[in-house]
Amino acid sequence: MTEAQTACATTETPVAAPAAPRWRVADVIALYELPFNDLLFRAQQTHREHFDANAIQLSTLLSIKTGGCEEDCGYCSQSAHHDTGLKAEKLMEVDAVLAAARTAKENGATRFCMGAAWRNPKDRHIEPIKEMIRGVKDMGLETCVTLGMLEEHQAKALAEAGLDYYNHNLDTSPEFYGQIISTRTYQDRLDTLERVRDAGINVCCGGIIGMGESRRERAGLIAQLANMNPYPESVPINNLVAIEGTPLENAQALDPFEFVRTIAVARITMPKAMVRLSAGREQLDDAMQALCFLAGANSMFYGDVLLTTGNPRAEADRKLLARLGMSASEASQLSA
């Protein structure tokens, strides 16, 4: 080797080793296994470092295109693969969506989410959805949409319309995923999330628990979310609603304390995220919902229906927050 070659060899930049995950599944399991009081104490401490512990964001979710979805998600009433009696409907008109958003704002919501039951939107769908986004934002509401998988140009178009958040859940851990859905891969979901992030839209990504997964698999979902770089700004945690006609209609109900533990673990591992109580709140009594707030949930979906499943009535939610001395926050950007 010549002197020049030797010099080149010795100054060559070494290849960096892959970054270690911030949270190993074993670490997340260890959080789950803490005594309940210790877990909630730690979660509440973490929560108070970044948020007003007595403020809850109220979100409303509207199904802007219902039923007839090509995917075979085992939990979903909107899948064309399942006989749930749900009638497929076309995309709602822009004016009807904006009217629903006005009602949501009048009822106290500060965030308006629009969901469409598609595998992926067609390009012809993007323009009316951009109109919906702009109209909702003009009302001073935060916007979120969930439309299925996105192409890069579609994500950019939504960003240009001013979309605040795009929701695309992982649903469960990579290991359990194949037992829930076969028509879309885990990597498909991660690819869409990357396109959303690259377009400059905040990521809303969480999952569903109570689908028959083990605690290890719940921990696997949380680890997957927490190890995203960065982790999602918004993390909805859904409690399975077992719907007649779906493959999971006979799923055993989850212990509500396990749901609260999941909220706490999400808060500890993703300290600055909005952790959102989503579907399945009807299965939690007021005391359990209060424990979820103590565990670090700082948003809840508000209104009588979430897409196609029931939800506690808005008046009951207002009364619960008043009993707890909590108030509705103006927006989700509460983190210090």
UniProtKB/Swiss-Prot annotation:
GO molecular function: 2 iron, 2 sulfur cluster binding; 4 iron, 4 sulfur cluster binding; biotin synthase activity; iron ion binding
Name of the featured protein: Biotin synthase
Coiled coil: none
Catalytic activity: (4R,5S)-dethiobiotin + (sulfur carrier)-SH + 2 reduced [2Fe-2S]-[ferredoxin] + 2 S-adenosyl-L-methionine = (sulfur carrier)-H + biotin + 2 5'-deoxyadenosine + 2 L-methionine + 2 oxidized [2Fe-2S]-[ferredoxin]
Family: Belongs to the radical SAM superfamily. Biotin synthase family.
Entry EC no(s): 2.8.1.6
Cofactor note: Binds 1 [4Fe-4S] cluster. The cluster is coordinated with 3 cysteines and an exchangeable S-adenosyl-L-methionine.
Residues that bind [2Fe-2S] cluster: 113, 144, 204, 276
Organism superkingdom: Bacteria
HAMAP family, sorted: BioB
Keyword Iron-sulfur carried by entry: yes
Sites where the protein binds [4Fe-4S] cluster: 69, 73, 76
Gene3D superfamilies: Aldolase class I (3.20.20.70)
Protein purpose: Catalyzes the conversion of dethiobiotin (DTB) to biotin by the insertion of a sulfur atom into dethiobiotin via a radical-based mechanism.
Domain called Radical SAM core: residue spans: 54-281
Listed pathway(s): Cofactor biosynthesis; biotin biosynthesis; biotin from 7,8-diaminononanoate: step 2/2
Keywords of the record: 2Fe-2S, 4Fe-4S, Biotin biosynthesis, Iron, Iron-sulfur, Metal-binding, S-adenosyl-L-methionine, Transferase
GO biological process: biotin biosynthetic process
Cofactor: [4Fe-4S] cluster; [2Fe-2S] cluster
Quaternary structure (record): Homodimer.
InterPro entries in the record: Aldolase_TIM (IPR013785), BATS_dom (IPR010722), Biotin_synth/BioAB (IPR002684), Biotin_synthase (IPR024177), Elp3/MiaA/NifB-like_rSAM (IPR006638), rSAM (IPR007197)
